[in-house]
Amino acid sequence: MKPRIDLHIHTTCSDGSLSPREVIDEAVRLEVNCIAIADHDTVEAYHEELIQYVHEKGIKLIPAVEISTKIKKCGIHVLGYNIDVKNPTFLKELSTLRNARQVYLKQVAEKLEVLGYQVDIDKLSKLETVTKAHIAKDIITKEQNRNQLEHDFGHLPNQGEFIETIMNEGCPAYVEKKTVTPKEAAKMIRNAGGKVVLAHPVSYRYEDNLSPKEILEIIKEMQADGIESNYIYIDKNQQKIDESNFWNQFAQTHHLKTTIGSDFHCKDNLHPEIGLIQENIHLSETEIHNMLEFLEK
């Protein structure tokens, strides 16, 4: 059987809908041989019970994390691979980032309440890593918010629409979250023994209007080892954009390693599933071997 890999998957430890164990089960079902759980600012998924479960299922699991950073008002995500998930300094640094998210939650909740929305701060604050997605989901699933949502949107919005209209920069409930720069995140990852990869560069072209040259400057500043070139981006019109060929060539030109990731959060009819099984991205066995060799060296 040809190997299949997916190096960017989220779980309920951050903003995914499946537990780490359920992610493993889904990977088995889809015949994906090697995965990396890369939750936001946490490595909580990597507990001994999961490692044992992965061993029983015969899947390769590469320890990973996705750190949220900011530079020049652009939100940049940095992936770390083959990190020491028990490194005490690294765990303390991640804890600091998560604590900043709790401060962010309270500030956003205050603005949302002024706008007429009820937010369950007590429930959300119990999450390991609270994100915009968690807050938006809490808002739009509350019956108490139905009238306000219909007043503001003319209909019941989905999670993404609520975030883009109410919570993003320039919107009424926007709050700037205290975080680290890409360079600082890269240093955290290296100090934990990991490889540094810029997540989904395609997204920064569409969300932040960054040119490839500007993206390259960020890559150079953080001294990234590679980029997540094989990736399906979903734009604001819910259209799939595949620039994998462009970013693979970009990586080759600038002597960067490449990775592949679904950025899986949940099962729906739009976003790629684990392993990008239904997408037109096909890696050769040699390409997969080279990726794994790079990450594990």
Residue ranges and their predicted role:
Residues 55-214, 285-291:
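Extended substrate/RNA-proximal surfaces in nucleic-acid metabolism proteins
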